[in-house]
């Protein structure tokens, strides 16, 4: 029998490796992303204090009739606006082991267009 690698286990392995190298502070928090089949979530995290500074997700937004890519872009815009409200302009991007493609890229591009630097 041919064994297929478990994609989520490989993603979690990449995520642990990435998290060993990056960390967020109050001045430059970590923009962490989680993607499920149905929704996408983004958080600004201060790892020094262990606090979530702001968050946004497709559950917050009224984007039920939009495509998943459009939903991700709306979340990117919302997290950038939440960061502006807290006077945060630069972040450390944590893609959580996901490939920088599709919904992850759409969220990142929308956040950049709305004023976040990373």
UniProtKB/Swiss-Prot annotation:
Q: What keywords tag this UniProt record?
A: Ribonucleoprotein, Ribosomal protein, RNA-binding, rRNA-binding
Q: Which InterPro entries match?
A: Ribosomal_uL18_bac-type, Ribosomal_uL18_bac/euk
What's the short name of a Pfam family annotated to this entry?
Ribosomal_L18p
- Nucleus as UniProt keyword: no
GO cellular component term of the entry, any: cytosolic large ribosomal subunit
One MF term in GO for this entry?
Answer: structural constituent of ribosome
A GO BP entry: translation
Q: Family per UniProt?
A: Belongs to the universal ribosomal protein uL18 family.
> So what does this one do?
This is one of the proteins that bind and probably mediate the attachment of the 5S RNA into the large ribosomal subunit, where it forms part of the central protuberance.
Note the subunit structure.
Part of the 50S ribosomal subunit; part of the 5S rRNA/L5/L18/L25 subcomplex. Contacts the 5S and 23S rRNAs.
The protein in question is named: Large ribosomal subunit protein uL18
Report the source organism. Lactobacillus acidophilus (strain ATCC 700396 / NCK56 / N2 / NCFM)
